[in-house]
């Protein structure tokens, strides 16, 4: 006798500007699903323009869980995401619907699918020391330091990925052990669901880059500059906070402070977004057992809808 099927859940993963939200909303029009955001920037209240957060009318029609959870002064971890996502998935399943998780924060997907190592809590004093070192020596030098003590983690991090470099160095210094070793020891903790993992990847990177540039231009027209000014007036913020490290926000802050010329602001924001997309594609290609679809395919929605129907009826 076959064991009963686990409840279904769908993951829609992909780089920025790949059309994930449009696919998720199309599924919500056709199937009894509820959406869960997997986006480390959209958890922040009042950060709407630069995160491409769905507008109020869209959210009224297609509610997303795990949006607008904390202020930009706060931090939100992968561990908290996993707990919140599993709670939301259980509630959606209990209501007779199918959870659809949609977003591009690959670290959150990894935490959900594989669990998390027992890593130490953040140490504000140590983080300040690491930031001071980085200010004096530069993040590429910090990357070189990490490579000496944790070559495996250093190999997968970009030399300017300050947030992850800071965390990896912090863990090494707090525990005396490399983060990669601690992660390897973590027991795989698969969520209790029958998962359909859908990946959206571009067949032509140049077209994705055009989408990224167009969307960043739309953010500028929608008032990204003013949004950052209002955030800085309302909250106690600095460039080391996760909220202000988000792509677009960092470049806007630096422009406002005169750290970069205003004429370079747009191009730097587009470049940073392209680098983010590159990292997301690398994660998706190397770390997940997803069924990949060309996000530039005009028939994308129909193909994924057909696959979803087959998955839910199997």
UniProtKB/Swiss-Prot annotation:
Lineage top rank: taxon: Bacteria
Catalytic activity reported: adenosine(37) in tRNA + dimethylallyl diphosphate = N(6)-dimethylallyladenosine(37) in tRNA + diphosphate
Gene Ontology MF terms in the entry: ATP binding; tRNA dimethylallyltransferase activity
Binding-site positions, ATP: 14-21
Function: Catalyzes the transfer of a dimethylallyl group onto the adenine at position 37 in tRNAs that read codons beginning with uridine, leading to the formation of N6-(dimethylallyl)adenosine (i(6)A).
Family, as annotated: Belongs to the IPP transferase family.
InterPro entries: Dimethylallyltransferase (IPR039657), IPT (IPR018022), P-loop_NTPase (IPR027417)
Region (Interaction with substrate tRNA): 39-42, 163-167, 245-250
Positions of the record's site feature: Interaction with substrate tRNA: 105, 127
Self-association state and partner proteins as the record states: Monomer.
Amino-acid positions noted as binding substrate in the UniProt annotation, renumbered to this chain: 16-21
Keywords: ATP-binding, Magnesium, Nucleotide-binding, Transferase, tRNA processing
Assigned EC number: 2.5.1.75
Protein name: tRNA dimethylallyltransferase
GO-annotated biological processes: tRNA modification
Cofactor: Mg(2+)
HAMAP family: IPP_trans (MF_00185)
């Amino acid at each position: 006798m076959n064991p009963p099927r686990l409840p279904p859940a769908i993951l829609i993963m992909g780089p920025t500007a790949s059309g994930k939200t449009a696919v998720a909303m199309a599924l919500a029009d056709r199937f009894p699903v509820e959406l869960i955001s997997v986006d480390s920037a959209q958890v922040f209240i009042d950060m709407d323009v630069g995160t491409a957060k769905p507008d109020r009318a869209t959210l009224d029609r297609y509610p997303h869980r795990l949006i607008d959870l904390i202020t930009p002064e706060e931090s939100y971890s992968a561990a908290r995401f996993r707990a919140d996502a599993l709670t939301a998935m259980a509630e959606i399943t209990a209501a007779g619907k199918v959870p659809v998780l949609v977003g591009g924060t690959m670290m959150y997907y990894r935490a959900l699918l594989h669990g998390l190592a027992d890593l130490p809590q953040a140490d504000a004093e140590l983080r300040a020391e690491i930031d001071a070192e980085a200010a004096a020596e530069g993040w590429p030098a910090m990357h070189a330091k990490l490579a000496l003590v944790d070559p495996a983690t250093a190999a997968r991090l970009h030399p300017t990925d300050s947030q992850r470099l800071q965390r990896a160095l912090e863990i090494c210094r707090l525990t005396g052990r490399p983060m990669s070793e601690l992660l390897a020891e973590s027991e795989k903790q698969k969520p209790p669901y029958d998962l359909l993992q859908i990946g959206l990847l571009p067949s032509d990177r140049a077209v994705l880059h055009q989408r990224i540039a167009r969307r960043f231009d739309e953010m500028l027209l929608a008032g990204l500059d003013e949004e950052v000014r209002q955030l800085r007036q309302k909250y106690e913020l600095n460039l080391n906070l996760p909220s202000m490290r988000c792509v677009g926000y960092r470049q806007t802050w630096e422009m406002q402070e005169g750290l970069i010329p205003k004429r370079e602001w747009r191009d730097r924001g587009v470049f940073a977004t392209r680098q983010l997309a590159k990292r997301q594609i690398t994660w998706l290609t190397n770390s997940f057992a997803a069924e990949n679809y060309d996000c530039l395919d005009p028939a994308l929605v129909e193909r994924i809808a057909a696959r979803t129907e087959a998955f839910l009826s199997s």
